[in-house]
Amino acid sequence: MNLDIVILAAGKGTRMKSLKPKVMQEFVGQPFLQRVINTAKELDPNKIIPIIGYKADEIKNYFSNQQLDFVIQREQLGTGHAVMQAINEITSQLTLILYGDVPLINHKLLIRLIDASKKTGIGLVTFDKTNPTGFGRIVRDDNKQKIIKIVEEKDCDHEQKKITEINTGIMCVQSDHLKKWLAQLDNNNAQKEYYLTDIIEFANKDKVEVVGIKADTETSIQGINSMEELILLERMYMQEKAEQLINQGVKIIDPNRIDIRGTLTCEENVTIDVGCIFEGDVSIKKNSKVGPYNIIKASQIGENTNLNAFNHIDDALIGDNCNIGPYARIRPATTLKNNINIGNFVEIKKSSIDDHSKINHLSYVGDTKIGKEVNIGAGTITCNYDGANKHQTIIEDNVFIESDTQLIAPVVIKKGATIGAGSTITEDAPENKLTLSRVEQKNIDNWIRPKKK
């Protein structure tokens, strides 16, 4: 698209009371600015131009692997002054101006704005707000059609303060017009700043129609200035996501107690209990249940699978008809196939487990390949690390490992083997045999138990 996108992101964010720049505060797991940039990329612009100031080096370092054209605003003298700093970077036909503290701006709204601006020359996003205090007002002509100017709150007269249509600050302007009008800005106002909104009056003087595109939801255009506003907007966002899932047939026990910090996709008859957190891309197939206080990151959950309470699942694939937890930890690069039982206080890392196998209690399984119909007893540990390198354990089909067993990798437990309780296995165990490594038991006669002195 013949479009440059300017993102205003220079402010300190004093009201956040934080050491971070405002645009680097996290909204649902990502910095504000990253979310705005993600939306900007969906529009396929020629350039994305963030205008930064406070802790500019910190921001540039964070985004160093992304194709962005940063511009520095050394003094914060208003929105108009900020865009002036980008004049030499703007080379496309249209310029879209966004704000780095509006994390939920969506590309569908922006496409409407861009399309309208192509036809008229300038467009801006507005919103009808019940309580418009603190926002610039959209002033229209006597027929309530044509936008003639925007008046900032501190410059409003008594009648203008009654207007409920507000300016969101988001606008799209044909670049030739923008450069001409920026050159005409002055700071003759209560704040002694260069207001970008003053270009609306210049547009009218040049008989360029100003079109207003109304946002459908307040969350999509809401800026964040304080930690309280951040928390409230996050909660509104979570509730919207929960309502969408409920409307798709997902049973969420309490929509006020769910955190969706990424993308959650659910099929039919999924139930999600209270206190669950979902991060990254998570999918849950039909008839599965997620118990209370599960944390699930970037994972796929199969059909008819039950996640009991208090599990932590990260970057894992869990198949159909599985039963997990409570208190299980499934770490990255783990694949559980179908009909698998993982019980309480079991940790699994970088392992694959085949159908109908179970690890019911208190075990660590790392860098391990487990076959079908394997039963691993309580207290089993795969010792995969020698202090320098990781090694693999292979447990073939139909193996039974009794309790309190250590498997010293690299090692193979072959098909049908049984490992006796309390063993430390350092060599491969043969097929269909009982393998033991216990110290011989001793019984001492005439033993006198020590007494306290």
Residue ranges, per PLM feature:
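N-terminal nucleotide-binding beta1-loop-alpha1 segment
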Residues: 1-18
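Conserved N-terminal catalytic core of the sugar/cofactor nucleotidyltransferase
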Residues: 4, 30-112
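Structural beta-sheet core signal
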Residues: 5-7, 50, 96-97, 122-125, ...
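Short glycine-enriched, charge-decorated loop/helix-capping segments at active-site entrances
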Residues: 20-26, 72, 185-188
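Conserved core of the sugar-phosphate nucleotidyltransferase
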Residues: 105-190, 197, 207-208
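Conserved alpha/beta core of the MobA/IspD/sugar-nucleotide pyrophosphorylase nucleotidyltransferase superfamily
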Residues: 164-267
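Acidic, glycine-rich loop-and-beta core segments that form the ion-binding/anion-interacting portion
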Residues: 264-334
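Glycine-rich hexapeptide-repeat left-handed beta-helix
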Residues: 308-453
